[in-house]
Amino acid sequence: MHATTQPFRPIQPLSDQLISQIAAGEVVERPSAVVKELLENALDAGATAITVRLEQGGVKRIAITDNGRGITPEQLPLALARHATSKINSLNELENVGTLGFRGEALASIASVAQLTLTSRTADAQHAWEISGVQGSDQKNTVAPSSGAPGTTVDVQDLYFNTPARRKFLKTEQTEFGHCAEVVRRIALSRPDVAFSLSHNGKTVDHWAVNDIAKRSAHILGSEFSGARLPLEETAGPLHLHGFIGLPTASKARGDAQYFYVNGRFVRDKLLMHAVRSAYQDVLHGDRYPSYVISLDLDPALVDVNVHPSKIEVRFRDSRSVHQFVFHAVSRALAQTSATAFGAVPSPTPAPSGALPWLREQQQTTFAPQFQQQYGVAQTTANYGALFNTDGAVTPLGTEPAPAFAAFTNSPAQTMSDDEFPLGFALAQLHGIFILAQNTKGLVLVDMHAAHERILYEQLKNALDDNAMQVQPLLIPITFYADDVEVGTAEDSKETLLSLGFDIAVMSPTTLAIRAVPTLLKNADAQSLARDVLRDVREYGGSRVLVERRNELLGTLACHTAVRANRMLTGPEMNALLRQMEATERADQCNHGRPTWVQLGLSDLDKLFERGR
């Protein structure tokens, strides 16, 4: 394969036409890029209603009409000139830009690869004026009278007609239309105060009337999202975060329902996406993606939007503080799902006669001291005590097989109001798997293993975060056969194991002895726990397992210890589990994002039995 050689040429300036076409390679990547640039111009012009008409996926025609301020006839030629704009006039304005567009190259770039006609009318003009984008050094753009309502229409036809090589890289009509429609949806989500209409090949595809973000997001993301979303509203100094995040149960197999905006601009920023993903990390499977519509507003001087040709990436002046703010805001919203559904979390109340005591301890911890000092905000999280005992240990549960339906009549529900306890009071245990409880809304079904697993997981996290992992020494050490790798891991990672609450000693080249386990896990299979911990520490390294794999490891430990199916619980034990669920953050989902309980309201039960028909 031989390299091609170019004839020797002297250095010379490029023509305006070629310069614009080179710029178009970055700005006009595909039809959807044209739609994006024109929609942003319409919004910058103050439009409150925008119509988008497409033909053949936008390749044959893209026509966007708005009711914005319009352009005077004297300014129309400048609108098609390269690097001409009304949005900035100095470096200071560029660094504080508040508009979506600012480079002044979009229309010129589009006109260099398509037939473009710009029609505009200001509110005080008697009629509209139009100009056609004519490329070529010997031709001038002429302004002519036209008809039209106040506002602007940009009509782009025959995209890439003069650059056939670019057309070859386009996909099918439906694919290109899909990209265009997604751009319209993104921008429509950012501006619910603006009406949008989208048509393709003469048929109306969608219309979004002026509305609030709740209804606009429900329209675009669908009923699945609107029925499983949490409101998000946080402010810290110059940072304001608002929008909606989906519950883990509304996660998707693809990340196509993730919309993040910075000062009204849709972005795909790695820092922000990582912050949101980290907040979901212990309530969502690794192969699932959360759904959300989040907007971050801040001083334009604190963010640089001029770092990517399509302005889809941004750079923050204090990226660490922004990351921490977004992460903790989303984490708190997810942690308050119970409170969102049922109201305030109940305060500690003495257990009724015959029931086991339960404990709720709240410790205040402040995150990111440097962030607090800079923005004057202190954020707190709640840490809770043990599930059944005040000493932090898990109460042993019955080991005998449970009957298919175990019920009890001496229920505290007879003497206490459901209003104080969102999850109500236990009625029965079903097949040794589910707890049936009654609250003021109707029937509550609890997956007892998933719920208990979540409670233990949160307790283990809190203990590890506070360096307060309580250890239960074993009266008689448990010895087991170990291979060379396990023995080596126990020797090399003793400090890591101790920090996790495990004291594992090497007795011989083939024998390990478990001398202590975490108090929270004292009723689990110690040998199985030890092998799992040794495997993870060996695979990821002692230091990494406590940072990168901490949540996965603690989730495994919690799963081993949580109450299993066919374990019969007494009435007080079931109620104690319900009370601790109410006092535990993120208790609505297990560690894998599945629901731990569901509510069947009285109306739902009426429908099942066709009552009232």
From Swiss-Prot:
PROSITE patterns per UniProt: DNA_MISMATCH_REPAIR_1 (PS00058)
SMART domains xrefs: DNA_mis_repair, MutL_C
Superkingdom assignment: Bacteria
One Pfam family hit: DNA_mis_repair
InterPro entries: DNA_mismatch_repair_CS, DNA_mismatch_repair_MutL, DNA_mismatch_S5_2-like, HATPase_C_sf, MutL/Mlh/PMS, MutL/Mlh/Pms-like, MutL_C, MutL_C_dimsub
An individual GO BP term: mismatch repair
Alphabetized GO MF terms: ATP binding; ATP hydrolysis activity; ATP-dependent DNA damage sensor activity; mismatched DNA binding
CDD domains referenced in this protein's UniProt entry, alphabetically: HATPase_MutL-MLH-PMS-like (cd16926), MutL_Trans_MutL (cd03482)
GO-annotated cellular components: mismatch repair complex
Keywords from the named record: DNA damage, DNA repair
Gene3D superfamilies per UniProt: 3.30.230.10, Histidine kinase-like ATPase, C-terminal domain, MutL, C-terminal domain, dimerisation subdomain, MutL, C-terminal domain, regulatory subdomain
Family assignment from sequence similarity: Belongs to the DNA mismatch repair MutL/HexB family.
HAMAP family found in the cross-reference section: DNA_mis_repair (MF_00149)
Function recorded in the entry: This protein is involved in the repair of mismatches in DNA. It is required for dam-dependent methyl-directed DNA mismatch repair. May act as a 'molecular matchmaker', a protein that promotes the formation of a stable complex between two or more DNA-binding proteins in an ATP-dependent manner without itself being part of a final effector complex.
Matches recorded under PANTHER family: DNA MISMATCH REPAIR PROTEIN MLH, PMS, MUTL, DNA MISMATCH REPAIR PROTEIN MLH1
Protein's recorded name: DNA mismatch repair protein MutL
Organism per entry: Janthinobacterium sp. (strain Marseille)
Protein's gene: mutL
